Swiss-Prot record:
Cell location: Cell inner membrane
Family: Belongs to the MceB microcin immunity protein family.
GO cellular component, one term: plasma membrane
Membrane topology, from the record: Multi-pass membrane protein
TM stretches of this protein: 1-21, 35-55, 67-87
Protein name: Microcin E492 immunity protein
One GO biological process term: bacteriocin immunity
Stated role: Protect the producing cell against microcin E492.
UniProt keyword terms in alphabetical order: Bacteriocin immunity, Cell inner membrane, Cell membrane, Membrane, Transmembrane, Transmembrane helix
Keyword Phosphoprotein applies: no
């Protein structure tokens, strides 16, 4: 299994979830709290989504690099979400 086929779904879901949460009115205003929410959300989705998929389907064939792929997909999703956070921050400063 390649990293692209494994990590696309969790990265996509974490980026979409971060975009939806960042638009809500209950989203924290301080940058530190935003980063904490970003990291926790991304970690939760990128690790638990593949694990629940494995357990729900019933194929317990967790391959050798499963946790490495989870960690790498988490880092990729955090990087994409930080870029989104930076763009939104720059956009809010202009207004």
């Amino acid at each position: 299994m390649t990293l692209l086929s494994f990590g696309f779904s969790p990265v996509f879901f974490s980026v979409m979830a971060f975009c939806i949460i960042s638009r809500s009115k209950f989203y924290p205003q301080r940058t530190r709290n935003k980063v904490i929410v970003l990291i926790l959300l991304t970690f939760f989705i990128c690790f638990l989504y593949p694990l629940t998929k494995v357990y729900l389907v019933g194929s317990y064939g967790i391959f050798d690099k499963f946790y490495l792929f989870c960690f790498i997909s988490t880092l990729i999703a955090i990087a994409i979400n930080v870029v989104i956070l930076t763009i939104n921050g720059a956009k809010n400063e202009r207004n």
